[in-house]
C-alpha cells in the first residue's frame, strides 16, 4: 500500500536522524520566541534586520490600504501592478543593468532561469555545492549537467574542454554558498566563461544587500558585474521582504518573460510585498554602516570560534558553520545550545554532503558584540562538554 511505503520512508529518515519537523517560531529582532522562550537567533537570513524595520512595515501597510490584498492574476494576464514597474526600474538603477524581472521566489527564479536558457542542446556546469534550486533547475532543463568539484576551477576547465563545441554552455554558481559561507571564485569563472564562450549565471541570494558599495552583491564588490550574463538575487534575506529578481541585458529579460514557466504560470506578488520591495531597494543602498557592522561582527565571531578549536570550514562571510560530522551530534549540539538560550539549527544530509552535518550560524547586523561574546562562551562550553573541542 502507498501509505505504508510513505510511512516506511519517514521511519527510515528518523533512523538516520534526517527526519524534519516544523517548529513554531516568532522572530523578534535578533531574538526568536520558541515554546515560550526568548532565544538569541543564529538561524535567520534577516541579515540587516530589515524584516522588522518600521520603514518597510509602513510601506507594506500603505500598499495594502491603497491597492488591496491580492494580485488577482498572473503578471501576463492582469496582475502586472504598477508597483512592479516601479520596483524593476529601481532594480535597474541599483544593479546597473539594462533590465530586470521580479519573480516570486529564489527557488522559482533559478528553476526558471535554467529551464529557459538550457535544453537538450546545452551543457550546464554547476558547482557541486550550489543551492538545491539550481540543482533542480538544471535537472528540469533536460540539458546535459556537469557538476564540478566545489570552487575547483581546474576541474571546471577540464569539463569545459570536453564539452561538445556546438552546445550552449552555461556556468552557474552561488556567489556565497548558503551552508558554508565561502565565496565562489568569480574572477576565475569570468576568465573561463570568456575563454570557452559560456554564459555565466550567478545566484546572489546571500550577498544581495551585504556586499558591494550599495549592497548590489558580490559581483559588484569584485567589480565583475559587467561580465555576468544573468544576475539572480532575493528580497527575502538581507532586504527583509519576499520574492526574487533576475537582472541582465534587455534581450535576456524579454526572453524570460516569454519562456520562464515559473514566471508565466504563477499568480503575481501582492501589492504589500511590492511596496516593501520598493522601499527595501531604496534604503539598503544607504545602509553602508549596517553592512560594515555585520562584516565586523562576522570577522569577530569566526575568529573566536576558530581560536576555540571549532571547524568552520572555509567561511569568510556572515554565514559560519560549525562542522561536527554525524547527524546525531549535530542535533544534540543544537539541542544543548537551545537549552542555553541560542538557536542554531542542525543542517544534515541531503542538504550538505554525508559526514558533514553542521550547525549553521548566520549573523545579523542588529546583534551586538556583547551578545556575541556571551554566545561564543556558551558555544565553547557546550563544544567542550560534547568533546567537539579540547
From Swiss-Prot:
Binding site for pyridoxal 5'-phosphate: 106-107, 178, 203-206, 234-237
Organism annotation: Anoxybacillus flavithermus (strain DSM 21510 / WK1)
Highest taxon in the source lineage: Bacteria
Modified residues (N6-(pyridoxal phosphate)lysine): 237
NCBIfam families in alphabetical order: bioF
Binding site for substrate: 20, 131, 351
Classification via InterPro entries: Aminotrans_II_pyridoxalP_BS, Aminotransferase_I/II_large, AON_synthase_class-II, AONS_Archaea/Proteobacteria, PyrdxlP-dep_Trfase, PyrdxlP-dep_Trfase_major, PyrdxlP-dep_Trfase_small
Protein name: Putative 8-amino-7-oxononanoate synthase
Necessary cofactors: pyridoxal 5'-phosphate
A GO molecular-function annotation: pyridoxal phosphate binding
EC numbers: 2.3.1.47
Catalyzed reactions per annotation: 6-carboxyhexanoyl-[ACP] + L-alanine + H(+) = (8S)-8-amino-7-oxononanoate + holo-[ACP] + CO2
UniProt subunit comment: Homodimer.
